[in-house]
Amino acid sequence: MAHTLGLTQPNSTEPHKISFTAKEIDVIEWKGDILVVGVTEKDLAKDGNSKFENPILSKVDAHLSGLLAQVSSEEDFTGKPGQSTVLRLPGLGSKRIALIGLGQSVSSPVAFHSLGEAVATVSKASQSTSAAIVLASSVSDESKLSSVSALASGIVLGLFEDGRYKSESKKPSLKAVDIIGFGTGAEVEKKLKYAEDVSYGVIFGRELINSPANVLTPAVLAEEAAKVASTYSDVFTANILNEEQCKELKMGSYLAVAAASANPPHFIHLVYKPPNGSVKTKLALVGKGLTFDSGGYNIKTGPGCSIELMKFDMGGSAAVLGAAKAIGEIKPPGVEVHFIVAACENMISGTGMRPGDVITASNGKTIEVNNTDAEGRLTLADALVYACNQGVDKIVDLATLTGACVIALGTSMAGIYTPSDELAKEVIAASERSGEKLWRMPLEESYWEMMKSGVADMVNTGGRAGGSITAALFLKQFVSEKVQWMHIDMAGPVWNEKKKSGTGFGVATLVEWVQKNSSS
């Protein structure tokens, strides 16, 4: 990697690895640093003698001569969501026992993922190297596999801290986790491996988002994509197009955005093909790849513009490339997947596009640029045309596209836009299995009136009213009617302001969706 502005280089770090083991043992017999018990409010019910009615809590409490009941009462632990207490009590094989509140019940992937994050939190706080997790209430047989996957994912992601740009960083101490009461055997082990593969894909996505724009230029993003392909060269090929090659493909919309930057654009195309068997379905995942967005001549100014966070404007590409990494590990059969990113910067210079310019996309449609800060859709336009030309059956694009979607849905969920009910059902089901939140928004065709231009086929933004919808309608102009297509506006959930970190949102849903379209 060449020297960057400020001479900044990230510390080379590998993701922290954890050994997961599924066990069916008596919790009293477990030996290690911290035993974590997930507890609902109902589990804490006591009989007339102030003894726990729950079998697991009763057994542990009896082994501790009533200390667990006594201390949990003194700590005012009621099992409410997010509540936790860590106790150091003599008499168990574990050095500590932690009670984690689950509320009324725990059943959804989101709830189990949150429990996993809580396990990570108490393990870090106690500097434990080994942990076990068990629920006071048993898990239903039909939900054990999905639950164990979400739990493991929560632990891996909960332990993640990005210390690459700190002069001193500390790695988590947790190395081994035993998961008790969720079953054992090949199916459980497969689910645990799947959870790890997806989680490390999410972490890769987070690291891409967190990388500052003076480090993660379009060229470096392309390098990172090429590394994924070379790591899994048995199933991946990479084609990185330079500016001249993009000109030959008439990508005028994409290149107009890139024109102002000293860092040239790089168009990324990875292709996954299964190692064995025939291909039944061809998919494309298209991610917005603005490694920095100044807004161009419509520069981002004023309170709330968050220009300092515009390194995350490549969050869509982070989701796509994180999914590529996970799919390289999982190797789903029967499905071919194209990963496409039009990477560039939106900067200001004498060579940049101006408000009022008319540009031409690779499908021949002309666009009047009435706002240079509505640039993501211009890059996606040519990326979507390119994706359709690969002969794919379905396309999902992801982008931090509009503030309007954040106003509508907040920061916990993304909006989805598609004319296909079938595709909507597929992707929403995948998001529910992965624990990510999506909400289907309308594609109101009458709003296209706001996108009409007097001098070109369309303008690139229709104003504030219905802004996320008109943005999706704009993208629709560059997708073949023969291809099922969905747009995901992930501007809200791309960033966790409390943790000051990218989330890797979208990776898990994309992998689940690809899996569902495979023949596995």
UniProtKB/Swiss-Prot annotation:
Coiled coil: none annotated. It comes from Arabidopsis thaliana (Mouse-ear cress). The active site is at residues 300, 377. Optimum pH is 8.5 for leucine aminopeptidase activity. Homohexamer (dimer of homotrimers). One of its GO terms (molecular function) is protein folding chaperone. It catalyses: Release of an N-terminal amino acid, Xaa-|-Yaa-, in which Xaa is preferably Leu, but may be other amino acids including Pro although not Arg or Lys, and Yaa may be Pro. Amino acid amides and methyl esters are also readily hydrolyzed, but rates on arylamides are exceedingly low; Release of N-terminal proline from a peptide. This is Leucine aminopeptidase 1. Presumably involved in the processing and regular turnover of intracellular proteins. Catalyzes the removal of unsubstituted N-terminal amino acids from various peptides. Possesses leucine aminopeptidase activity against the model substrate leucine-amido methyl coumarin. Possesses Cys-Gly dipeptidase activity. In addition, can cleave Cys-Leu and Leu-Cys dipeptides. Functions as a molecular chaperone to protect proteins from heat-induced damage. NCBIfam families: PRK00913.2-3. Pfam families: Peptidase_M17, Peptidase_M17_N. Its EC number is 3.4.11.1, 3.4.11.5. It comes from the Eukaryota. Mn(2+) 2 binds at residues 293, 373, 375. HAMAP family: Cytosol_peptidase_M17. Belongs to the peptidase M17 family.
